[in-house]
Design a protein with these regions (language model features):
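C-terminal catalytic histidine-bearing segment of alpha/beta-hydrolase fold enzymes
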Residues: 204-260
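Conserved alpha/beta-hydrolase "acid-adjacent" motif
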Residues: 196-205
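Glycine-rich nucleophile elbow surrounding the catalytic serine of serine-hydrolase chemistry
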Residues: 113-123
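Short beta-strand/loop motif that positions the catalytic acidic residue
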Residues: 183, 189-191, 195
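Catalytic nucleophile-loop/oxyanion-hole region of alpha/beta-hydrolase
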Residues: 50-60, 71-108
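Short, surface-exposed "cap/lid" segments of acyl-processing enzymes
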Residues: 31-35, 39-62
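Hydrolase active-site cap/lid region
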Residues: 123-169
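N-terminal cap/lid segment of alpha/beta-hydrolase-fold proteins
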Residues: 1-32
Length: 260
């Protein structure tokens, strides 16, 4: 079991990337970072306003205590001005782009998204949307929106995000679903075997949708782990999260040739 360190001193800032009060990210910078990578956290909560970036604060602090530079982003959610699709997605891209230009953070970025944040992180890492990303880690991500809708994984929330059923908002469904995009950067999908809120089959479906033009992608099912244990710094899953960040930050992107 890997547990976070509590010794490393940190600098904390809250930075604005847009005019709205929620268009901010929290940045934690260790005094002695162990890698030239910034971990960009994207929280879940079914794209709703009931959850915000505070939900991932324990994970962000743990990663920073372990030597990672961390930026936990906020984004426009359903019910806010411009919330829904595509506003929620473009808000996440804007947040990641702001982190990439922050002079106090390493400019190699790995996105780590939980639940609905996994959908947003993988979507941002696809189809050339975020060139600054070098890797992505999905934690119990809602990576197949049609399957999530069919399995009633917050189906009303999926439809609220996309403006209705597939036949009512076909363009939004086509654009937002990660299964229909080309993955640009290496990805690790972590999913708890005991997750009853977003079953592992949702991540498995995304993995099956990958093709030869995609970057590397693998799925790891974590035993005795549920939907929220996967983001718990004290859970055995924490070591797998840090290992996945290490893995994708050093792997080659889609279309990359051999390293020199």
């Amino acid at each position: 079991m890997s547990t976070p360190s509590l010794q490393r001193p940190l600098q904390r800032r809250t930075c604005r990337f847009g005019p709205q009060e929620w268009e901010v990210y929290d940045a934690w910078t260790p005094d002695a970072p162990r890698a030239d990578v910034t971990v960009v956290l994207v929280h879940g909560g079914l794209w709703q306003t009931s959850f915000d970036r505070a939900h991932l604060r324990p994970l962000g602090l743990a990663l920073a205590r372990d030597g990672w530079s961390v930026a936990s982003v906020e984004y426009t959610r359903v019910g806010m001005p411009r919330g829904g699709w595509p506003g929620t997605g473009t808000s996440v891209v804007a947040a990641i782009e702001a982190v990439a230009t922050d002079p106090e953070l390493p400019d190699r970025l790995v996105a780590v998204g939980h639940s609905a944040g996994g959908q947003l992180a993988v979507w941002a890492a696809s189809d050339g949307r975020c060139p600054a990303l070098t890797g992505v880690v999905s934690l119990a991500g809602v990576l197949d929106l049609r399957l999530a809708d069919t399995d009633e994984v917050g189906s009303e929330a999926v439809r609220a995000l996309l403006g209705g059923a597939p036949e009512q908002s076909p363009q939004a469904w086509a654009d937002a679903d990660p299964t229909l995009g080309r993955l640009d950067v290496p990805a690790v999908l972590l999913h708890g075997a005991a997750d009853t809120l977003v079953p592992p089959s949702v991540s498995a479906s995304y993995l099956r949708s990958r093709g030869p033009s995609d970057a590397s992608c693998r799925l790891e099912i974590l035993a005795a782990c549920d939907h929220f244990g996967i983001i718990g710094p004290g859970h055995t899953a924490y070591g797998r999260v840090t290992a996945a960040i290490n893995e994708v930050s050093t792997a080659a992107p889609a279309g990359a040739g051999p390293r020199a």
